[in-house]
């Protein structure tokens, strides 16, 4: 079995269907003895350029290990599913389990914004307590 990295973009109107789609694809992979090494839901993001007058899409990244027959079945599923706008399959030499740079940058942004929110909350609470003391 070979290792693959798959990214697919789902139409923004179908974002609610993403968990069911991912579950269907992971079942397809694991039923044949394959493995899902990494699965990341990047959420709805801006596209670099419009595709069929669509400016945003829901991104999903999967790193899998599967047979050629499962991969061709996945490609057919992507091709005939109208909800999937684009997909990319890349063969990898080994399994990738690290957090992707996009997901890591989201984590850093969350960590940066959390202290700022806490500072704002503390500042606001100080103002409120000062007002109540008067």
UniProtKB/Swiss-Prot annotation:
InterPro entries: Ribosomal_bS6, Ribosomal_bS6_CS, Ribosomal_bS6_sf, Ribosomal_S6_plastid/chlpt, Transl_elong_EF1B/ribsomal_bS6. One of its GO terms (biological process) is translation. GO terms for cellular component: cytosolic small ribosomal subunit. Keywords: Ribonucleoprotein, Ribosomal protein, RNA-binding, rRNA-binding. The keyword Metal-binding does not apply. Residues 97-134 are annotated as: Disordered. It comes from the Bacteria. GO terms for molecular function: small ribosomal subunit rRNA binding; structural constituent of ribosome. Gene3D superfamilies: 3.30.70.60. CDD domains: bS6. It holds the Pfam family Ribosomal_S6. Residues 105-125 have a biased composition (Basic and acidic residues). NCBIfam families: S6 (TIGR00166). Binds together with bS18 to 16S ribosomal RNA. Belongs to the bacterial ribosomal protein bS6 family. PANTHER family: MITOCHONDRIAL 28S RIBOSOMAL PROTEIN S6, SMALL RIBOSOMAL SUBUNIT PROTEIN BS6M. This is Small ribosomal subunit protein bS6. It comes from Marinomonas sp. (strain MWYL1). The lineage of its organism: Bacteria, Pseudomonadati, Pseudomonadota, Gammaproteobacteria, Oceanospirillales. The gene is rpsF.
